[in-house]
Structures are given as structure tokens and as C-alpha cells.
Amino acid sequence: MTIQQKVPTVGFVSLGCPKASSDAERILTKLRAEGYEISPSYDNSDLVIVNTCGFIDAAVEESLDAIGEALNENGKVIVTGCLGAKGDIVQTTHPAVLAVTGPHAADEVMGIVHTHLPKPHDPYSDLVPPQGVRLTPDHFAYLKISEGCNHSCTFCIIPSLRGPLVSRPVGDVLAEAENLARAGVKEILVISQDTSAYGVDLKYRTAFWGGKPVKSRLKELCEALASLGIWVRLHYVYPYPSVDDVIPLMAEGKILPYLDVPFQHASPKILKAMKRPASAENTLERIAKWREICPEIVIRSTFITGFPGETEEDFDQLIQFLEDAKLDRVGAFAYSPVDGAKANELGELLPEDVREDRRRWLMQVQEDISADKLAAKIDTVIQVLVDEVDEEGTIARSKADAPEIDGLVYLDGHFDAQPGDFLQVKVIDADHHDLYAQVV
């Protein structure tokens, strides 16, 4: 005999113009698609959503009255719609509401509903798990915040494949992140083609999440993600000045002190040919500033060797930059022509063996730098996230290591741990890529 679970029921009040009605229909459709019941009665509802209007004074008064009635009759009220975008008028008048959003915020409203009235997951009837269908292990997930790119790097054809920058609404991004955290994900890896440009196309528009305004900009997005209480790691960060704004968040422990910035080269001539920003001198100054603000910061980057026109002098400048910057993690690629890329028009391609030899030499230089940096961690205690547990042992990662591209922490001994567990470990050895540690 099976015990039938009570279906969560949502009361709904919609005021205002046809555009408000359209927003209401989107919310109602999502509620029904997820299995929530809709009720015209306050009494039979587990909570009530009031879709408001704020166009004229009479509409504001009507909306505030409707919110008050819902609070009196039910007690659990979510407010959405135009009135929610007019400052703090709702919270000031009715501080007991659960949350407030602006208009066209269906996904944000659903996230709030999930928080206050989660629908029990039924593996027999629900086609999709709460966190969505994922290809990654259960304890970490990639969170794409935008699509496309506005740059015209000569070695890249991404803009022609994926189009210009299109940022996801911040409420949608945060709702997905919240679902992931609720499903047990311990680490979110923020990705896009150009993470630091997030929100540029939206003109940094303010949206609502959890009843609070959030600007569609990287700093504010990171602050909101930090409230989830899990690891947040930034990837594919273009070296804009705005990146400086997130470094204090790393210093405060709100997001991981990890920055993946693809510098690509250090020679001014080659950077110009690539149509990449900055110069080696300016970049070194910024790295020094980042480390001054957040001494624990880990900087990962990628470089291209053998780009068309790269001379021995250009390559020497790149090697000198590596030795000066002392980056923590580096990946390198020998230049390979891409059909449709403008770099194909820059001149004769360097011989393949030259391109590959330079890549190998760069990585050898970086191995020595990495070995010194990792050796400095011996005898320190660090936090790690367990990735794998089998009969051969336990493999984890530190805050300095992204999955698949960085190093690992191999744990000595046998103990009770599962993937997704956080552990405190003491580093006992290191090589140029990985750490070896014991649980403390």
C-alpha cells in the first residue's frame, strides 16, 4: 500500500493589464508543469502569489489591499509584478510577505516557491530530477551565465558560431544555482565565453531574486552566489578592469580565490595581432594588485605558442612574463589554424615543429614554477573536496584546483568519506602538478 503525498497548492491573484496577465500565465504554466495545484481560494492554499500593478496610484492601492487581504486570510504571500519594482513600498507596507519580485520574473517566482513550498520529488512520476540532467558528478556542476562573445580575437571563430554576447537573466541564473545547491551540489563552476562581460548586453539591468534586487553584473552575481554557501569558481574571465571588483569577494572568503584568465600571450605585437587587450607590464601590475588584496588567490591562464608572426623575441617575452608572473596553473596550445579565423590572413604559418617545441618549452618553464608553488604547501592544512573513493584510495581537490584541468590531492590512508565531502587535510608531499596529504 502506498501513501499518497499531498499535492502542494498555490493560490493566485492577478491584477493589472494584459502584460501582467501574460506574466501570470507563464507562472501558472510553470506551476502546473511541475505538478502544483492552483486554487482560487485562500483557505485551501499552502501559499498565495499576488501579481501586482503599480502604474497609477489607484492600482498601487488596489495591489497593496490585495496583498494585505492575502496575508490576513493565508499568511504566506509572494508578491510579483510591477509594484515589486517600485522600491521598498511592498516591504514597508507589508513586511510579513515572503518575497517580492518585479515583473516578467517567472523563473525567479518559481525559485521562491521552491524555497517556501518545495514539491516532494517523486522518482516514479517526475521525469527530471530537481537539479536537471547533468553529465558531471553529483557534487559539482557547470553554470553557464551567458552565450556568445562580442570580441573579434583573430584566432577564434566563436562569435560566428555562437553569435554575440547574450547574458542570461540574473534571476534565471540564480534560480538554477539555487536548485543545484538544494540538490547537493557542493561546487559551482561559472562559465561562459566571456564571464567578465556578463550583463553588458543587458545594460546591467536589475532583477529580483529571493525578493531582493540583484544587478546583472559579475560582482553582484558573485555576491548572490556566495549566499548559497558552496564553492563558487570563476572561469573564462576576460582581463577587464571590472575583474578587480571580484577580488575582494575572494579575500573575504565569499567565492573561491581562483581566477581563470586566458592571457594568451605577453608580446605587445602578438597581442595586437590576436586583437587581445592589455600588455605584459599592465598585466603584471594587476596580478600584483590582486595578490596584494587576496594573497591566497590562484591564477590559471592559457597561452598560444607559434602564433603567425611570432619571433624568437616575441616568445622570449612570453617566457619572461611567465617567470615574472609566477602563475599557479597554466595550459598551452601550439597554434593551429582554424578555418574561417582571421589569423589565417596574418602571414606564413610557422613550422609545426617550431610551434610544438615552443609549447613544450613553455610548459617546462611552468612546471618548475608550479613545483615550487606546490612545495610551499607542504606541512600546511587545507580544505579539500572529495572527488573519488575506491579500493585504491581517495582523490580530492583543493580550492586551487578546478576539475579536469588542474591538479589533484591524493589522500593517504583509509577513512570514511564519500564524493562531495569536505575534509581538512595536511599536505605531506608535492610534485609539479599534484599534492599528497593526510586527513587531520
UniProtKB/Swiss-Prot annotation:
- Keywords in alphabetical order: 4Fe-4S, Cytoplasm, Iron, Iron-sulfur, Metal-binding, S-adenosyl-L-methionine, Transferase
Q: How is the cofactor bound?
A: Binds 2 [4Fe-4S] clusters. One cluster is coordinated with 3 cysteines and an exchangeable S-adenosyl-L-methionine.
Biological process (GO) annotations held by this record are: tRNA modification
Compartment(s) of residence? Cytoplasm
Question: Any idea where the TRAM domain is?
Answer: 375-440
PROSITE patterns, per the entry: MTTASE_N, MTTASE_RADICAL, RADICAL_SAM, TRAM
MTTase N-terminal domain residues are: 8-118
Residue positions binding [4Fe-4S] cluster 1: C17, C53, C82
GO cellular component, alphabetical, reads: cytosol
* Residues that, per the record, bind [4Fe-4S] cluster 2: C149, C153, C156
Q: Which cofactor does it need?
A: [4Fe-4S] cluster
EC main group: transferase
Q: What biological function has been recorded for the protein in this entry?
A: Catalyzes the methylthiolation of an aspartic acid residue of ribosomal protein uS12.
Q: What is its EC number?
A: 2.8.4.4
Q: Which reaction does it catalyse?
A: L-aspartate(89)-[ribosomal protein uS12]-hydrogen + (sulfur carrier)-SH + AH2 + 2 S-adenosyl-L-methionine = 3-methylsulfanyl-L-aspartate(89)-[ribosomal protein uS12]-hydrogen + (sulfur carrier)-H + 5'-deoxyadenosine + L-methionine + A + S-adenosyl-L-homocysteine + 2 H(+)
Q: What is this protein called?
A: Ribosomal protein uS12 methylthiotransferase RimO
A GO term for molecular function:
metal ion binding
Q: Which family does it belong to?
A: Belongs to the methylthiotransferase family. RimO subfamily.
* TM spans (from-to): none
